[in-house]
């Protein structure tokens, strides 16, 4: 199973927290000390906590669970999309729309509209419209794709959230808490760990650190899914006998 070592984390700068004046005292148990007015995260805590989170995500994937990757700030956006796509999972990487989980009924209607517009753009419907109407629909399609493209094939609520930056994505975390969906999150020294089921104390800004987390999670999800596919194949083989 995918695991991450102390050396990997040091190389990626996972241990660099935020400036000391921005700290959240609830993160004290995970802070090693300060250097040049920047908090240093205790990787002796982070390494086992991250590997424990990976093991749990592996189990969720092995039982066909859906993982929703959430990272809407610019530093994480592209990497979040790539990681989710690489393991056939789902993502929100632009803006978290309030109610995305708690008001799933409405979101489902917007997804239906997005799929209808996609069909229209491909079956020649747009070409039959006036220029103005076609432009309006194209803009609507782009807007919906931006907001919902990463969850349009999710087919229901996710079984877990993997979040980059608990502070920035606090609305998503609150919605998951309300619905009892487990939250796995990268929590920096300026963030509140409350509401996060699997806290991963670490830098949430450095591209290398963000890529390290996402790469490991995508790998563990792929592994979990292949276990599920292998057991399905075994079952059908037994039935055939």
UniProtKB/Swiss-Prot annotation:
Swiss-Prot/TrEMBL GO biological process terms: translation
Q: Name one GO cellular component term.
A: cytosolic small ribosomal subunit
* CDD domains for the chain: RPS2
Task: Report the domain of life of the source organism.
Answer: Bacteria
Query: What does the UniProt keyword field contain?
Result: Ribonucleoprotein, Ribosomal protein
Which residues are listed as membrane-spanning? Answer: none
Q: Name one GO molecular function term.
A: structural constituent of ribosome
Matching PROSITE patterns, A to Z?
RIBOSOMAL_S2_1, RIBOSOMAL_S2_2
Pfam family example for this protein? Answer: Ribosomal_S2
Q: Which family does it belong to?
A: Belongs to the universal ribosomal protein uS2 family.
Query: HAMAP family recorded for this chain?
Result: Ribosomal_uS2_B
Q: Do you know which NCBIfam families this protein is assigned to?
A: rpsB_bact
Q: What is this protein called?
A: Small ribosomal subunit protein uS2
């Amino acid at each position: 199973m995918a695991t991450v070592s102390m050396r990997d984390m040091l190389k990626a700068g996972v241990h660099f927290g935020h400036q000391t004046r921005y700290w959240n005292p609830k993160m004290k148990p995970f802070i090693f000390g300060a250097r040049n007015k920047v908090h240093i995260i205790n990787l002796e805590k982070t390494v086992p906590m991250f590997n424990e989170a990976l093991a749990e995500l592996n189990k969720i994937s092995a039982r066909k669970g859906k993982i929703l990757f959430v990272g809407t700030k610019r530093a994480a956006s592209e990497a979040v999309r790539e990681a989710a796509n690489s393991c056939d999972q789902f993502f929100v990487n632009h803006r978290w729309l309030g109610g995305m989980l708690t008001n799933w009924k409405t979101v489902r209607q917007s997804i239906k509209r997005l799929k209808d517009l996609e069909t229209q753009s491909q079956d020649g419907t747009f070409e039959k419209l006036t220029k103005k109407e076609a432009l309006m629909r194209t803009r609507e399609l782009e807007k919906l794709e931006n907001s919902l493209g990463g969850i349009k094939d999710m087919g229901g609520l996710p079984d877990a959230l993997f979040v980059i930056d608990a502070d920035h994505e606090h609305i998503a975390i609150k919605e998951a808490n309300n619905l009892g969906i487990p939250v796995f999150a990268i929590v920096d020294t300026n963030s509140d760990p409350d509401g996060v089921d699997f806290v991963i104390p670490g830098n949430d800004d450095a591209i290398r650190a963000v890529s390290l987390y996402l790469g490991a999670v995508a790998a563990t999800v792929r592994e979990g899914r292949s276990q599920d596919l292998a057991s399905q194949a075994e079952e059908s083989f037994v039935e055939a006998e």
